[in-house]
Amino acid sequence: MKKENQVNLGRRQLLKSTAAGTVLTGIGGTLSFTPIVEGIAAELPAPLRRTGVGEWLATTCQGCTSWCAKQIYVMDGRALKVRGNPNSGVHGMSSCPRQHLSLQQVYDPDRLRTPMMRTNPKKGRDQDPKFVPISWDKALDMLADKIIALRVANEPHKYALLRGRYSHINDLLYKKMTNLIGSPNNISHSSVCAEAHKMGPYYLDGNWGYNQYDVKNAKFILSFGADPIASNRQVSFYSQTWGDSLDHAKVVVVDPRLSASAAKAHKWIPIEPGQDSVLALAIAHVALVEGVWHKPFVGDFIEGKNLFKAGKTVSVESFKETHTYGLVEWWNQALKDYTPEWASKITGIDPKTIIAIAKDMGAAAPAVQVWTSRGAVMQARGTYTSISCHALNGLFGGIDSKGGLFPGNKTPLLKEYPEAKAYMDEIAAKGVKKEKIDQRGRLEFPALAKGKSGGGVITANAANGIRNQDPYEIKVMLAYFNNFNFSNPEGQRWDEALSKVDFMAHITTNVSEFSWFADVLLPSSHHMFEKWGVLDSIGNGVAQISIQQPSIKRLWDTRIDESEIPYMLAKKLADKGFDAPWRYINEQIVDPETGKPAADEAEFAKLMVRYLTAPLWKEDASKYGDKLSSWDEFVQKGVWNSSPYKLEARWGKFKTETTKFEFYSKTLEKALQSHADKHKVSIDEVMKACDYQARGHLAFIPHYEEPYRFGDESEFPLLLVDQKSRLNKEGRTANSPWYYEFKDVDPGDVANEDVAKFNPIDGKKFGLKDGDEIRITSPVGMLTCKAKLWEGVRPGTVAKCFGQGHWAYGRYASAKFGVTPRGGSNNDLIADRYDRLSGASAFYGHIRVRVEKV
């Protein structure tokens, strides 16, 4: 058979399988047909060999926070191939490998195809929901009745909206409608993503956001756990440029495991989990003692003589700073004692190595960039690791410098819809003033996003609030694009919490672990192929805004999560007498050209995107970047690009209390003082309540906090290293066959297996060999998988990739759907702990485990 015939046969069989499969009717639901996808893998330069002529259509991948602009090759109504959008100024046609898995996502025969209703009133992991199909009208009628009942009872605050991954049209469903109903409980996933990562940049240079790294011009890259070519932000761009960067920059990766980026680096330092700040602080110490800090940015001694000597204090008046604040205070309070020898005792890293790295960074300055990652900072005391590592970017002058790092470029994109307070009645106005269910802002949970007490979300703690009914119970919940039972530490807490919610509706593409506890399932259109939306991304010195648009006809009776569903729900609420959301939608979210509201939910989905993006194409956006002539041009190109970032743009006007890069953070001092005053305690009492070790001025400077460990070392001798796969689309590729077939693209992993990786030294110690069935146990849970002996993991640790261990989601994700997991979920082992200053969940550094053969 010819290749082109094989391709078309595969496509026809795929169509047949997806049309013939059935929806789930509980655990025993029929899951027949395995799709054949030869057509997806084939190259497509000769479209005439197919049945028709194809075209590339622009969209955006929402599968991770890279938010890459894409083009979908569509022929005969089928999506066949994905590539980077060549109009992107960030990554061009480059893409990460997981883009291809999206094809298996959209054509997944196990996708939820129609609304479903629970018929088993009992909730629990061991309870078959016995879902049965219902109409959209019935599903939304049930949800609307529950919301109306809360308002009639004057308890609208007992409604909660839970958000997972989102696009920029989320504001209506996430915030506006939640507040109009009368609830403060719009709970995002952010604190299980990377909130602790933002603490260093914000409290040192005022950027509450993620940085872009000028790897094209870098001369030294120091990465604390970041894996740019596999799982860090903007993987497409870094995958394209990393090889060239290795030619002109020295790359050092600090990570307990040999990541994809570490495997290509000039030096890999397999550090003990939780000790990253030790190395960072020792490097800073050497930089000052050796006089290799970047003086044009930082400043110098007035007399020109270096007075930094290990263990000796320095007069503040002797040093004149330029664009920084508090260097000498930092030295005197802590840094003078953080010698390479001190660091070596803790980390085992040779002092000569530390000295060499510091000198190399000084020689390369200011074309120096220091990366942090989830692994280094999403720990129980991770704020200070984030601050300590980021301080090096200031010390070596990489901030806003060529070859360094800088924040995102300014764009005119709107990210919110008009204010809705005028539409709030007395019931809503009273309800939104209630404490949030995640308990943010309490003494023990500062969550200091952007310097505000309670300014950040504490996603995982919402489960504790719900299950303990503290500060109150949640009776009605709407959730979308999330699976917190699987993605949160100690996810079994969510099983308990959701079992207590009277009514929950879940918007989802697949029946997940979270869905298992739902009363109504609402099938979502796929974000990349069937949705209208808009996203942005940064990299390569520019910001891009890219569109999501339907490239194929939606396969089943699905609706778009952030537009069509809230529109339909608002109309249903209005029919029942509560018309505030409906009036707001039709009076405020109108077409930017005609001024008219949408005629139906399908038109509204596009209108929402037109509204937010109008400043790009309706107005002259050339002040910020590209000039677009029309909406149609934006849709066709799919991308708007900003002008290049202006180097040194923030020097002298950082958004900190001093307008300087703060080694002594007056910004953090102010935030902590505000939180302390709120609770009528001292800052030291705040630090104690939040389980940090710093007292006094130490709390405001980069310093070492001993890593928190959970579990007795004698019983649990190994430290867990939770890692992310380059094939993960945040856990949502688990029902893609290719995810397992190509699993060995992750260093040390094995195709079609779920393995935990042990150093051969530990393998010998615990009597393990490759392929052994093992049980890994922590103080809070256990999992089973297979052992893999591998030199790419530090002795004393066990590295395991997050992503497997589903007991729901579909036929490939689970061993037996609804019953038996395929492999093990890392989060079953990870105790519910927090970096309390940021509100971030701690996934790393603290979990001790033991291993035994099964």
Swiss-Prot record:
Phosphate is a competitive inhibitor. Disruption phenotype: Deletion mutants are incapable of growing on arsenate, but are still able to grow on a wide variety of other electron acceptors as efficiently as the wild-type. SMART domains: Molybdop_Fe4S4. Residues 54-110 form the 4Fe-4S Mo/W bis-MGD-type domain. Arsenate binds at residues 166, 190, 198. Keywords: 4Fe-4S, Iron, Iron-sulfur, Metal-binding, Molybdenum, Oxidoreductase, Periplasm, Signal. This is Arsenate respiratory reductase molybdopterin-containing subunit ArrA. It comes from Shewanella sp. (strain ANA-3). The lineage of its organism: Bacteria, Pseudomonadati, Pseudomonadota, Gammaproteobacteria, Alteromonadales. The gene is arrA.
